[in-house]
A protein has these predicted regions:
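Walker B catalytic acidic pair
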Residues: 86
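Active-site-proximal or metal-binding-adjacent scaffold patches in catalytic folds
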Residues: 1-81, 90-131
Length: 131
């Protein structure tokens, strides 16, 4: 029996690869967030992907956490810190003193992580940046 090869355009290949990448990212982020949500005593919030150019993550007033897809390329300890940072926003929707005290309870060296996170974009391949 003859098999005809599947022919895809570059655009179709890109869509297929990006859909796969997005599924991997959601799985990865949920797996990383779950233990920290449990530690904080909050339910695991919905996580969605972002293509933000200047933010690694954000937390909406409804508790949804948006994470930049490029986080897949930075060091795991920075991703873990960012999960703590965003999950703390489900309790304090600002960067008040109380918010930072909560972050510090779970990540005592958060200031060093903040600095490292600001430099982490250098670890992201060009093709994965804000596309």
């Amino acid at each position: 029996k003859e098999h005809n090869p599947i022919t895809l355009t570059p655009h179709q290949i890109e869509k297929f690869v990006m859909a796969w990448y997005n599924r991997q990212a959601i799985t990865y982020f949920n797996e990383r967030a779950e233990p920290y949500a449990h530690k904080l005593g909050v339910p695991l919030p919905p996580i969605k992907l972002s293509r933000a150019k200047t933010r690694w993550g954000s937390c909406s007033s409804t508790g949804t956490i948006s994470l930049n897809r490029a986080l897949m390329f930075i060091k795991p300890e920075l991703v873990r810190y960012l999960m703590t940072h965003e999950l703390c926003h489900t309790m304090h929707m600002n960067h008040s003193l109380r918010y930072w005290q909560l972050v510090e309870c779970y990540q005592p060296d958060y200031k060093s992580f903040e600095k490292r996170l600001h430099q982490a974009s250098l670890q992201v391949p060009y093709w994965a940046r804000s596309q």
